[in-house]
Amino acid sequence: MTATVLLILRGSEGIAAMLYEHVIRPALFCLDAERAHGLTMSMMSAAQALGFGRLFMKSIPEDPVEVMGLKFPNRLGLAAGLDKNGEAVDAFGALGFGFIETGTVTPSAQPGNPKPRLFRLVSEQSIINRMGFNNHGAENLVKNVTGRRYKGILGINIGRNNTTPLEKAGDDYAACLRTVYDSADYVTVNVSCPNTPGLVKLQDAGSLKPLLTKILTERDTLAAEKGRKVPVAVKISPDLQKDALLAAADVIAECGADAVIATNTTTSRDSVSGNPLSSENGGLSGAALRDKSTEAIRILNGHLQKKIPIIGVGGIFSGADAREKIEAGASLVEIFSSLIYRGPGIVKKILRELK
């Protein structure tokens, strides 16, 4: 992976793609999925330690857009979940991302769910995970991203600790927000991960309104103290029925959140029913999520009528996939699974195809 990143930085994208497809990916896919993820993160951290940061400014393809009051170098970002602890923001930034979303982090470190908890559905270019917000805690993330060289936009995705009662969830989100506020260009409130017990119930309009009111009141207090208002986005599930989706969208807009991210992973297995791994519990992402997430974006866009922007994520493997989500109503898009299946070169490939 480190060699692939270096080749991309030197402009050898074709060679990098071949190296990933024929050497690196087969080697990684021989390993357990979570072990491969850990090895990838180690390689990206090593790439960062080698000083690739000096090349970051000229490695971010420029196609600027303003969203949430922030100037994004381009529309393509890294979705939350890959660099949970912000350990390799500079190295991922070197790939060309206009923004990077780290996390999900919680107030206190937690181990997440028992292993195995990450599965590749290779024939469907998809992934099932039931990680359970494993992370080193919000303070650790802040330490990791302090002093970063990456010049794009940094988002920090926050959540509730598994041991926190649902009725106290607002305290966790507010605590996380306070911890990461100075380090974040924007913050994402994750209320849609299917792998944390009870979390998705927070998307219900009756629960979401008091939660967001608490979080956004805390944001406004911090903004007054620090003289900088950090935008807050809310990440939602693709599994909400249309009425519930629209009700959640109304609450998000009315409470004063700055964007909605559509979508998180799905618990549906309709698109992968023939795969023997489809019976594994967890959230499904990747190509199998593409149509479901795009439809959610289309519904949200028609309902919100540009009141707040939409960030689209789910199954983007090409510039055409990204364009489809933008045409459905997304202002920005994020990728995750395609980076695993196609390698680091996918970033600049998508950006080139988008142009």
Residue ranges and their predicted role:
Residues N161-A174, K201, S207, A233-A253:
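Active-site glycine- and acidic-residue-rich loops that bind
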Residues E101-Q110, V191-C193, A259-T267, I316, ...:
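Glycine-rich phosphate-binding active-site loops on the catalytic face of alpha/beta enzymes
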Residues Q110-Q125, D270-G282, S338-K355:
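C-terminal helical cap(s) of enzyme catalytic domains, especially alpha/beta-barrels
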Residues G103-G152:
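A gly/proline- and charged-residue-enriched helix-loop-helix capping module
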Residues L70-G77, K151-I156, L222-L240, H303-G312:
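Short beta-strand/loop segments at the ligand-binding rim of alpha/beta enzyme cores
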Residues N85-F92, L240-E254, K306, I316-V333:
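Catalytic cores of alpha/beta
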Residues I15-E66, N129-N134, A138:
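An N-cap/entry alpha-helix motif that binds or orients negatively charged groups
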Residues M41, S45-A47, F52-K58, P194-S207, ...:
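Glycine/Thr-rich beta-alpha phosphate-binding loop at enzyme active sites
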